[in-house]
Amino acid sequence: TSKFSFKAVNSYSEAVSALVYRQLNHLLDQPQPVDLTEHFSEPISIANHAFVLGIPDSMVNEFERTFVGTVSRHERIKYLREVYQFKLENPGDDVISHLIQSELSQAEVEGLIYVFFTSGRDSVAYMISTSMVALLQNPEQLKLLRENLPVSKEAVEELMRFCAMFVTLFPRTALEDLEIAGQKIEAGQSISVSPVAINRDPQIWDEPNTLKLDREVKAHLSFGHGIHGCLGQQLARLVIQESLTQLLRSINSIELVSAEQLAPMEFAHPVATYKVGSVFLKFEK
């Protein structure tokens, strides 16, 4: 959909900045230590998701309950159809409205809405939280970033490389015998690519386990690649960039108290992916 194009994403800048600012003020009002994920990263990701898809404000809380929380599939479908009906009667310039106005059947549109409701949200929250963990564990890089605000696109790319969320991507099946980098693969065998491994491959990256915000980042695989690459990756970049910029501009001193990301994390389905964990911070405004 065109709502995720470069041009469209650029038009979201003001709205994204406003929702980040609103959530930042909420974060700053919390008693410390405060969980960055609970009070900043996840709410920003959910609000941004709802905004772009076209979920009205009055239905966002129910979106969080049904598609972020754990409920039955029946409840999810019921809510999805309520959103569908609302957008059918109240169309706007958003993803869901554009899908409804397309030539797709209602069943096809509902299927795509379900995919959008369950995709991309966790990865943005994960990237915001783990980026802050990475920066706080690399104070010289944090200092470099503070001295060069707003956060540059190059810095965002390096953070995405360094903090990749997906352990594996969806498997693909070889249609014929082939050989890749000396590895023979027979027709019918499944192949699963690991962004975490590729993003830390010493044959591709110089000092891959070192965070270098001034690194000239090549094509990392944090958002996949090609026709199956993440549809919302440009929007994710904007949200991550704006969130880190506002956070670092508003807080002078930040201390990492604890981070669940440092411990082995469970895998979520249907692909192997790190789950978003708590990141407790203390800070001075």
Residue locations for each model-derived region?
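Cytochrome P450
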Residues: T1-K285
